Amino acid sequence: MQEVTIYSDGACKGNPGPGGWGAVLVAGGHEKELFGGESPTTNNRMELMAVIEALRALKRPCIVNIYTDSQYVQKGISEWIHGWKARGWKTADKKPVKNADLWQALDEAQKPHQITWHWVRGHNGHPGNERADALANRGVASINT
């Protein structure tokens, strides 16, 4: 299987407000940049969209390393989702899971791949995540024009 590295980020001007997502995919010396935007939305929805759209861009099953500065995404997909699914998309205190539509989409998008999730501190000079951040901000700008 091909190895792919994904750097993802989301941005929101106001929360909720206009938002954008960005992702950089790196594989075999090739790079692809993706971005988009929505309004109104939240930063967490944009963080999720970045990863979902990056995974949807992969044409075949891959070994994937995903770098995100969102602990919400990293912990949600690695730890919390198992309980949510077991409880019918409810939290431990029986409330509906926020952004369940996107968590379900991410759960589906990750299925064909072998994924390792990595959390990186945001705005800390990590080149891949800085690029993803710039793309997310382009996503915000794309809906403000």
UniProtKB/Swiss-Prot annotation:
Give the UniProt subcellular location, in the record's own words: Cytoplasm
Q: Which domain of life is it from?
A: Bacteria
What's a single GO MF annotation on this record?
A: RNA-DNA hybrid ribonuclease activity
Q: Which UniProt keywords apply?
A: Cytoplasm, Endonuclease, Hydrolase, Magnesium, Metal-binding, Nuclease
Single GO cellular component annotation? cytoplasm
Disulfide bonds, which pairs? none
What EC numbers are recorded for this enzyme?
A: 3.1.26.4
Uppermost EC category: hydrolase
Q: Which CDD domains match?
A: RNase_HI_prokaryote_like
The cross-references to Pfam families, in alphabetical order and at most eight, read:
RNase_H (PF00075)
Q: Cite the binding residues for Mg(2+) 2.
A: 9, 133
Residue span(s) of domain RNase H type-1: 1-141
Look up the record and name the cofactor or cofactors this protein needs.
Mg(2+)
Family as reported in the entry's similarity comment:
Belongs to the RNase H family.
Give the protein's function: Endonuclease that specifically degrades the RNA of RNA-DNA hybrids.
The record's annotation in PANTHER family points to:
RIBONUCLEASE H1 (PTHR10642:SF26)
Q: What is this protein called?
A: Ribonuclease H
What gene is behind this protein? rnhA
